[in-house]
Amino acid sequence: MKKIYILGNGSFAQEVFEQIIVANQIKNFGGFIILKDDKAFCIGEEGAEAFTYPPSAQFILGTANPNWRKKFYNHFLGYYELNINHWPNMAAPNSYQSLSSTIGIGNLFLMFSLVNANTQVGNFNLLCTFTSISVNCGIGNHNVLSPYSSISKNVCIENSNLLESGEILFEDLESECILTNGVVYAND
């Protein structure tokens, strides 16, 4: 049986465990994975041990920190193909993704996150609790929407952006920006 692992082991990874693994009654949980000195270790029921990179493993990016998300992604990209078999989309039972939306791979939808009609979602995006993406939107890859953040209708954002808690985005956003306190900061 193929196992699913959470990449990360902090408090956010514990939240992902409760909202995804426990709430969906997933029985093939393999453990939490950490990186130390560019080596992967699995923390499971029997303690921590070197990760053996099983060929059928599946992964959930279980950190909200953009830097750690990038480290995990880059590390495991060297061992696993970018496909839905290794990087499934995972959703809390009370999240919603419109049937008319298009969704890539490796996305994580936590409790009460909402993806409305005719929206395109790229790969490896994180929608935290109570986030929403309105109709006719598009988001690229590797974006983090913190709790209670929203993207207004007909808005597109590119890649590797961070919307801080409670922010509402009304205009398109280029790559590598942070929206906080109503101000967009380019990540130069």
Which residues are covered by each model-predicted region?
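Flexible, charged surface loops at secondary-structure boundaries
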Residues: 1, 26-27, 51-56
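Glycine-rich adenosine-cofactor-binding loop
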Residues: 2-20
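Residues at the starts of beta-strands that form the adenosine-phosphate
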Residues: 3, 28-30, 58, 86
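Short hydrophobic segments within beta-strands
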Residues: 6-7, 62, 164
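Short, solvent-exposed amphipathic alpha-helical segments in soluble enzyme
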Residues: 20-23, 76-78
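NAD(P)-binding Rossmann-fold cofactor-contacting core
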Residues: 23-41
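Phosphate-bearing ligand-interacting subdomains
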Residues: 39-92
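Structural signal for interior beta-strand "rungs" in well-ordered beta-sheet cores
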Residues: 89-188
